[in-house]
A protein has these predicted regions:
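N-terminal strand-loop-strand
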Residues: 1-29
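Conserved hydrophobic/aromatic beta-strand scaffold that supports enzyme active sites
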Residues: 10, 19, 84-86, 107
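Short loop segments at secondary-structure junctions
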Residues: 14-16, 88-93, 110-112
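Short aromatic/basic micro-patch
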Residues: 28, 79, 107
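The catalytic Nudix box helix
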Residues: 29-64
Length: 143
């Protein structure tokens, strides 16, 4: 089995979340493999920018997820362990990167995003992240 460390972002603009539709018609969160000793924070920020055109800022860590799949190109099982960061976008502006195989991107209200997101694990992560985001934003407003 091939083990890969990855990093990604759960990006909010106000009360909306950023998700993408990939080449397999799956609605996912932006993420990528950590290579050459890069920091997970940097990889997460770079993948968000590269995949969606959004210049987000990290406001907190969210946790980790892990999933396994069989890679047809590698002909072996792969385990991706992903470190997730809660991020805030400066504006509701994005840019679809079709060169990476993405078909759609956008900021969606929580209910719509949860309906669209393909994987249960990602839906749980988004729900948890939304709660944490609201708590952090309320703390900042009161400060």
């Amino acid at each position: 089995m091939l083990f890969r460390n990855c990093a990604g972002g759960v990006v909010f603009y106000e009360d909306k979340i950023l998700i993408l539709k990939n080449e397999k018609d799956e609605w996912v969160l932006p993420k990528g493999v950590i290579r050459n000793g890069s920091l997970s924070r940097d990889v997460a920020l770079n993948r968000v920018k590269e995949e969606t055109g959004v210049d987000a800022e990290i406001i907190s860590s969210v946790g980790e997820t892990c999933y396994e799949f069989f890679s047809l190109t590698r002909q072996k099982p792969v385990c991706n362990e992903i470190t997730w960061y809660l991020m805030k976008a400066p504006e509701e502006k994005y840019e679809l990167n079709t060169e990476l195989g993405f078909k759609e991107v956008g900021f969606f209200h929580l209910d719509e995003a949860l309906e669209k997101i393909t994987y249960n694990q990602d839906r749980s992560l988004v729900s948890l992240s939304h709660k944490k985001y609201k708590e952090l934003m309320n703390t900042l407003i009161r400060a």
